[in-house]
């Protein structure tokens, strides 16, 4: 069904304008399936034989079975397999590819695409699902932002605050953190907490810095 409606609104010159538009209600498709999630693998220390697990959804009204599947890594087809079960209308099913994938290069981000290839699929735009997965380094932590102090008036002895992130796969604790102002002597302290993989935390240095003199300061 197509519905037409008219709306009045103010234009940029404060004059009334009329807009005529339409929208359509559709009963959907009988044959329409697609991959709606890639649940495995996740970011971490990965190997040359990683299992790929996906979720398949039946978006259509007709039950579907024997659904062809394709698996790609960085655009390269690595597997063509078949889901042999049956998925009812608007339901999902999990599938694990028999073919594993090589994600063993440390520090590399891979693009994984899983796709249905149902013959007669009436809406193919929702067939594929893509996920980026990174093979994290074991130990990789760094400062991503200095959040304090900020430019302003009336500055004095100010606390230096930084956001730290664990980019690696292993939890990190008891590591040195430092700041330097205008290329001077580094102020080194120890972060005694624990940052889990891909987690961010705020660290406030105990030793403050003097910003009372007018001017621009470079903090690294």
What are the roles of these predicted feature ranges?
Residues 28-220:
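Extracellular/luminal regions of secreted and cell-surface proteins that mediate adhesion/ECM remodeling
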Residues 1-28:
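Beta-propeller fold recognition
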């Amino acid at each position: 069904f197509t519905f037409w409606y008219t709306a009045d609104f103010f234009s940029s010159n404060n004059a009334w304008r009329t807009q005529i538009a339409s929208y359509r209600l559709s009963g959907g498709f009988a044959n329409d399936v697609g991959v709606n999630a890639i649940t495995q693998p996740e970011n971490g220390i990965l190997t040359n034989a990683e299992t790929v697990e996906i979720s398949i959804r039946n978006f259509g009204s007709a039950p579907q079975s024997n659904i062809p599947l394709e698996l790609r890594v960085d655009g390269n087809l690595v597997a063509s397999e078949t889901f042999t079960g049956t998925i009812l209308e608007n339901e999902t099913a999990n599938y694990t590819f028999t073919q594993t994938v090589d994600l063993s290069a440390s520090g590399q981000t891979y693009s994984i695409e899983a796709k249905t290839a149902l013959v007669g699929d009436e809406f193919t735009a929702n067939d594929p699902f893509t996920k980026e997965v990174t093979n994290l380094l074991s130990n990789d932590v760094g400062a991503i932002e200095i959040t304090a102090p900020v430019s302003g008036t009336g500055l004095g002895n100010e606390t230096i605050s930084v956001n730290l992130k664990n980019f690696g796969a292993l939890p990190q604790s008891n590591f040195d953190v430092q700041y330097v102002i205008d290329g001077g002597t580094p102020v080194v302290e120890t972060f005694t907490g624990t940052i889990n993989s891909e987690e961010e935390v705020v660290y406030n240095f105990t030793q403050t810095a003097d910003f009372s003199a007018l001017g621009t300061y470079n903090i690294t």
